[in-house]
Amino acid sequence: MAEDLSIITGSKQEQYQSLLPQIKGLLDGETDLVANLANTVAALKEQFGWLWVGFYIVKKSFDYAQDELVLGPFQGPVACTRIRKGKGVCGSSWVEAKTLIVPDVEKFPGHIACSSISKSEIVVPVIRNGNVIAVLDVDSEELDQFDTTDQFFLEKIVELISF
């Protein structure tokens, strides 16, 4: 597939239905993880225009006894580099191994404010062999931006990525 996206307007579901096979086309045959994560976030950011889209990858910590989430490929304003397990929305999604939709980040206990512009968030864990190995984090400057449609399609998108 050419490295171009066909950006469409329409309902959120229609946009995802158009984007999903395009992301699959970008990932097919590419084995480099960074390239695949980068193209995935670029495609999502280009289609939806969200404030921030990126991955945090579970890695060994140099100065902390446990693994932590380390910033991976992203698009948007500069971001927090490391997140400990159980901290913030990303760390909570990691611990719970489930997608978290946060309509208002100010009301999420322990929210880590990497950007004061962010108003709502969805975090989707990437699970392989029963373990969370990364999370996809998406932030919006609008309250209540994300719903179960986003959850359904973003979970499908992270399943496409080979780790």
Annotate each predicted stretch with a short phrase.
Residues 1-73:
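Intrinsically disordered, low-complexity terminal regulatory regions
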Residues 58-61, 65-114:
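Regulatory sensory and allosteric helical modules in signal-transduction proteins
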Residues 52, 123, 135:
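Short hydrophobic/aromatic beta-strand element in the GNAT-like acyltransferase core
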Residues 2, 20, 24, 140-163:
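Juxtadomain coupling helices with adjacent low-complexity linkers
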